[in-house]
């Protein structure tokens, strides 16, 4: 999040891991780099706790950042987005001394954040300084998964409350229609096991979700995940995958615009 990245090790890691990254091939200017096996393996314990794998994680983080920046460029006529990334090195005060997930996220740009600060006042606006307290579009890696999502962190109560207030003012059907355009995604409430599958949602199922969702207490996410276990990882290493991630994140932009506080979605303090 908004923390210094710290020391970057020059180590190359454990050469015994199968599928070590080959020498990079020359790619067209502006092309997104495909993922490599080390992007995932450097996040698996015990490597996730080792600074010897900082270089691998830094390379993976930069690939994710390029995906998020491509999304921001593509979406700039619809919404202005600012890109941030997670840290890639084990740093106990931030990640408990292990890096098991890397992400890049696109969230409201400085001008939009300034408007929100004016709306909520200086005291509450202090919470906006950490980017994750704003809703965001996310590209993420774990040892066994690749993910794109729209997420409102449990501490991002401004946007969570705005979302809930909008559904109360307009009813759930507009959101239902947006979610059911997102075949392949699922709606997620914190770490609950409920199945809210986009493309198959009914108004009753969405009512069930919002019966339990509490801004400030629960994570809200609309996410799509691809398995990346070593035995089946070849699919996520294909050169077209980063562009696919940009495409899938672009599909989330309408839900982002619906939920996030803005001039066009101003429900935060509605009665």
Q: How would you name each of these model-derived features?
A:
Residues 100-175:
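Aromatic- and glycine-enriched beta-alpha-beta binding-site module
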Residues 45-56, 85-90, 174-177, 187:
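Alpha-carbonic anhydrase
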Residues 68-117:
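Glycine-rich, compositionally biased intrinsically disordered regions
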